[in-house]
Amino acid sequence: MSRYTGPRLKIIRRFGGLDLPGLTRKRPKNTNPPGMHGAERKKKSEYAIRLEEKQKVRLNYGVSERQMLRYMRKARRSKGSTGLALLQMLEMRLDCIVFRLGMAPTIPAARQLVSHGHIEVNGRKVTIPSYGCKVGDVITVRNKESSRKLVAAYAEYPGLFLPDYLEFDKEKLRGRIKELPPREQICAPVNELLVVEFYSRKL
C-alpha cells in the first residue's frame, strides 16, 4: 500500500474528527464519516478497530505499508515496549523532526523541504525524508536565501508546540535532538498496543 495523497479532511472525517497533526492543520466543519449522513454506525469488529489504529499511524506520519512493516520488525527487536519503540522510530524520522521543530506546518510539507534539499543534518544535506535521526543530531536549514525564507515563514506559525526533547533557535533556524521522545510528547493520538496486535499475525 503506497503513501496516501488524497483529500486530507476526508481522512479526518473518517476518524470522527480526530486530530492528526502530522497530516493536516485544517479541521472539517462536518465530523461525520463520509457517506454516513447521520446513519447509525455498525459496531466495529476487533480487527476493524486494530486496522483503524494502524491506519491512523500510517496517515499521521505519511508512511507506506512496507515502511510500517519494516519499522515493526525493528521495534520488535528492541528492548522495552514494542509500541513505544515503533512510535519513537517514526518520531525520529527527519521529516517528523523538521515538523516538530516548527520548520514546516505538516509532515507532508516537511517531507518536501527535505526532498528538495533545504535541510541539513550535522552540516550535511540530507534529501531522504525517512532518514533516521539520532540523539545529539543538529538539524539546520541550508545557508541559501530561498531555503531560509521558506522555513522562516513556516517557523512563525508552527504546527505544534516545541517538545522538551528538542531545542530550536528560531533566529539561526537550528534545532537539536536532546533525547528520545517520551510517550506523552509523541504527536500520534493512537493506541499503539492495538497497532502491535494488528501486526502480530503478519510478522
From Swiss-Prot:
Pfam families: Ribosomal_S4, S4. GO terms for molecular function: rRNA binding; structural constituent of ribosome. GO terms for biological process: ribosomal small subunit biogenesis; translation. Keywords: Ribonucleoprotein, Ribosomal protein, RNA-binding, rRNA-binding. InterPro entries: Ribosomal_uS4, Ribosomal_uS4_bac-type, Ribosomal_uS4_CS, Ribosomal_uS4_N, S4_RNA-bd, S4_RNA-bd_sf. Residues 20-45 are annotated as: Disordered. One of its GO terms (cellular component) is small ribosomal subunit. The keyword Disulfide bond does not apply. Signal peptide: none annotated. Residues 92-155 form the S4 RNA-binding domain. SMART domains: Ribosomal_S4, S4. Belongs to the universal ribosomal protein uS4 family. One of the primary rRNA binding proteins, it binds directly to 16S rRNA where it nucleates assembly of the body of the 30S subunit. Part of the 30S ribosomal subunit. Contacts protein S5. The interaction surface between S4 and S5 is involved in control of translational fidelity. This is Small ribosomal subunit protein uS4. It comes from Synechococcus sp. (strain JA-3-3Ab). The lineage of its organism: Bacteria, Bacillati, Cyanobacteriota, Cyanophyceae, Synechococcales. The gene is rpsD.
